[in-house]
């Protein structure tokens, strides 16, 4: 973590995001254009992961390593992206866009900064991890920049509820799949050893509390500028109506 190779990967990801931001603006990407591009990267990413993470089955043949099942928060966003791409317009789709924009940005950046697959240049999953999360970050920022996402107080509350529901869901999933040592959403143990804040030095429950608090604080700080802007807009509109 934060080695020379890691900084190279971070630089590649930042460059990719900047290039895609510029290209999307220059070509005036529609939401559908951006969705199709992201889904293409998702397809490549999942294909790479499946090809790399197949393991021998007990009774012959092979199966996907249960640790690679799509229950991490960034992997769950694959399904949300599919609905955004192919689903009907409406309140549900808008809620998914709102959730995706925030969690995708935070999750993508966190995954780039904490490389759980390592940073080696000769491992396929490393390429898959960095490029997927770089694209995820770009797409999430695209949703915000081009005003497809609406981020206010009510959206903050909705996103908090959904995130907590996913936390509870993965507490169950990690328990069901405990024999396979899964760690979805990193609520079993830290994503990497030796992290300064996310560690088990003070016991599991302190660690879990810190994970939850980081999620709540991160979500709150992300929404804060939009909530302030929304409130100012409401006050301005109210003053105008009075006048």
Please tell me what each predicted stretch does.
Residues 1-12, 154-165, 177-219:
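Membrane-interface transmembrane-helix boundary segments in multi-pass integral membrane proteins
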Residues 7-15, 70-80, 100, 113, ...:
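Membrane-embedded alpha-helical segments of multi-pass membrane proteins
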Residues 16-22, 80-83, 135-154:
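Alpha-helical transmembrane segments in multipass membrane proteins, preferentially the mid-helix core
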Residues 23-24, 47-59, 112-121:
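Juxtamembrane "helix-exit" motif on the non-cytosolic side of transmembrane helices
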Residues 41-51, 104-115, 163-172:
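Aromatic-anchored segments of alpha-helical transmembrane domains
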Residues 58-71, 121-131:
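Non-cytosolic membrane-interface motifs at loop->transmembrane helix junctions
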Residues 83-144:
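Membrane-proximal helix-loop-helix units in multi-pass membrane proteins
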């Amino acid at each position: 973590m934060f080695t020379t190779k890691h900084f190279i990967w971070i630089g590649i990801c930042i460059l990719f995001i900047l290039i895609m931001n510029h290209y999307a603006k220059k070509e005036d990407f529609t939401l559908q254009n951006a969705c199709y591009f992201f889904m293409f990267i998702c397809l490549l990413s999942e294909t790479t992961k499946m090809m790399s993470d197949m393991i021998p089955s007990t009774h012959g043949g092979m199966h996907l390593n249960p640790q690679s099942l799509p229950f991490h928060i960034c992997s769950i966003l694959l399904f949300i992206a599919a609905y955004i791409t192919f689903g009907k317009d409406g309140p549900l789709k808008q809620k998914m866009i709102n959730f995706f924009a925030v969690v995708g940005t935070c999750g993508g950046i966190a995954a780039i900064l904490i490389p759980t697959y390592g940073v080696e240049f000769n491992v396929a999953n490393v390429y898959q991890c960095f490029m997927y999360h770089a694209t995820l970050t770009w797409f999430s920022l695209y949703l915000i920049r081009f005003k497809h996402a609406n981020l206010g107080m009510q959206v903050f509350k909705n996103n908090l509820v959904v995130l907590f529901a996913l936390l509870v869901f993965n507490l169950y999933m990690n328990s069901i799949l405990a024999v396979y040592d899964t760690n979805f959403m990193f609520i079993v143990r830290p994503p990497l050893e030796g992290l300064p804040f996310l560690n088990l030095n003070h016991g599991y429950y302190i660690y879990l509390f810190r994970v939850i608090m980081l999620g709540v604080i991160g979500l709150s700080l992300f929404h804060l500028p939009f909530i302030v802007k929304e409130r100012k807009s409401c006050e301005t509109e109210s003053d105008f109506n009075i006048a």
